[in-house]
Amino acid sequence: MPDLAAIVARNVRAERARRSWRQVDLAEKLGWSIGMVSETENGKRRIGIADMPNLCRALDVPLTDLLQGAEREDLIALKL
């Protein structure tokens, strides 16, 4: 079972790809470096709860889209 961070990373990568954006495009929208986006998408950088609103705005998706595939227990632990 993948952990929540891996699920969010996969969903961020999928949303970016769906828009045909390069990592640099998402980085510019977030005010992040390309390396931060790459590390986030590859699970090398944990996505903090504070990052979620910015990711949702940049990708123009609701939080539920980034959490799609998460286990109920993970969401309960986050109090979502």
Region locations from a protein language model:
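A detector for short, charged/polar N-terminal pre-domain segments
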Residues: 1-7, 75-77
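Short basic helix-loop element that most often maps to the first helix and adjoining turn
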Residues: 10-29, 54
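Conserved hydrophobic/aromatic packing and binding residues within compact polymer-binding modules
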Residues: 12, 26-27, 37-40, 66
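Recognition helix of helix-turn-helix/homeodomain-like DNA-binding domains
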Residues: 31-47
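DNA major-groove recognition helix of helix-turn-helix/homeodomain DNA-binding modules
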Residues: 50-65
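Short, charged recognition helix plus adjacent turn
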Residues: 57, 67-80
